[in-house]
Amino acid sequence: RSDDLAISERHHGLVPSNERGRSQTHIDRMARLHRDAVELPEQRTHPASATAPPAVVSASPADHRETDRVRIAYASDSAFGFYYAGDLEALQAAAAELVPFSPLRDRDLPACDGLFLGGGFPETHMDGLEQNSSMRAAVAAFIERGGAVYAECGGLMYLADSLTWEGKTRKMAGVIPAEVVMHPKPQGRGYVRLRETAAHPWPLSGDGSEAISAHEFHYSALRQVPEGLDFAYRVERGQGLDGVHDGIVYRNLLASYAHLRDTRSHPWAKRFVDFVRRCRVA
């Protein structure tokens, strides 16, 4: 056993690499220890018998006309970093140019046609998120102008009025009229099954006939949620926002606890890019 191999943990599991800052150094250390302790030539003489599944070939961004292309800014810093690489690639294949930005450090949004606010740990960075009032205002203004925005879990939390954790409350973007409160135990964890409603801004089926498979893992829950909100999903399995609904819809924003995965049966990335294209704002 070596303490050099330990990886920090907290309420959601391992501390993600976008927060550690020295992840590559840690990986290099593990590689050296493995090289010194394991007979690699012996391993090479016994290759695994299983073969990798065939890769899914997507259209290249170069296959699209320049007029089809859109710029999607996505939150990427130590507070927000949960994205599937395959989903980002699917967005690019659908003619999206992805532009990272930091809700913690940047003062304004980059020039963009749409926003993708992914998962992360806004609760551990809520002081910095509150202090960056210019970015919170920029995100809120983009949504109010009708910009297309997709937010998952941590992104949803950032868009609420406030975030409370360990007895402290900090202001967030103030787009979703509700408070987010962290709890000691998970409020939603595992696979979810959803049905789209007529309010979904970029639906798969439009009539709710297709079940949407996704997953959730959140210690937070919404409080003081007003009546009359529109929801994109009915929850058939899982928790979502309240055990019945998920996916708050406001203007051209969809914000949910569910994490989608772009697949053949549920190609959400292209549908979102098409929606961004239809909603371009000046």
Identify the function of each model-found stretch.
Residues 31-34, 75-78, 257-260:
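Structural motif
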Residues 1-64:
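Internal gly/pro-rich beta-alpha loop/helix module
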Residues 115, 152, 173-176, 217, ...:
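Hydrophobic, well-ordered secondary-structure elements that form the walls
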Residues 67-68, 80-99, 110, 182, ...:
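C-terminal and late-domain segments of enzyme folds
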Residues 122-201:
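Cysteine-nucleophile active-site neighborhood
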Residues 68-133, 137-144:
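Phosphate-binding active sites in nucleotide-utilizing proteins
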